[in-house]
């Protein structure tokens, strides 16, 4: 969890660069990527908090295993769900608000039961400790 919160601190330092863009890496600017990561944190935290541990389905996923082992998600292999895509126009205040919301969401996971989980469309059900690692790797 410390690593995830540190990433959010780093985002705050990078926020003034929100309009910067490197077309060799991505069509989207820095602000879009920060907001996307924050929206992912918010949506996953919400799903974890409301999950019912009794409905958890354990299933081994080689893809999840490799991503979490290598601490890297291959670029360009998946499309972000629409609810994790920021609006087309990104402002500094929007970026800072998303960082603050993501920090609150991440901190809410500190009191969540470790048996809670969220369902990833490719990796399946990920319990809280694994989900936190996934958030760090993704972010």
Model-identified regions with their sequence ranges:
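A structural signal for well-ordered alpha-helices, especially hydrophobic packing surfaces
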Residues: 12-15, 41, 45, 103-110
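Hydrophobic packing residues in well-ordered alpha-helices of helical domains and bundles
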Residues: 1-4, 8, 30, 34, ...
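An N-terminal domain-cap segment
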Residues: 1-27
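Acidic/histidine-rich alpha-helical segments that form the ligand environment
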Residues: 67-116, 135
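Short, contiguous alpha-helical
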Residues: 19-70, 111-139
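Short acidic/polar alpha-helix capping motifs at helix-coil junctions
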Residues: 8, 46-47, 84-85
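General secondary-structure edge motif
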Residues: 13-14, 75, 79, 86, ...
């Amino acid at each position: 969890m410390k690593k995830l919160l540190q990433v959010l601190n780093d985002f705050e330092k990078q926020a003034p660069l929100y309009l910067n863009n490197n077309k060799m890496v991505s069509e989207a600017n820095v602000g879009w990527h920060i907001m996307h990561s924050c929206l992912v944190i918010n949506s996953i935290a919400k799903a974890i908090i409301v999950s019912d541990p009794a409905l958890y389905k354990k299933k081994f996923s080689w893809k999840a295993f490799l991503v979490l082992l290598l601490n890297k998600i291959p670029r360009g292999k998946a499309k972000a769900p629409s609810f994790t895509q920021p609006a087309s126009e990104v402002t500094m205040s929007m970026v800072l608000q998303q960082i603050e919301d993501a920090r609150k969401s991440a901190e809410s996971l500190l009191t969540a039961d470790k048996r809670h989980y969220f369902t990833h469309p490719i990796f399946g059900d990920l319990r809280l400790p694994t989900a936190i690692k996934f958030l760090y790797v993704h972010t």
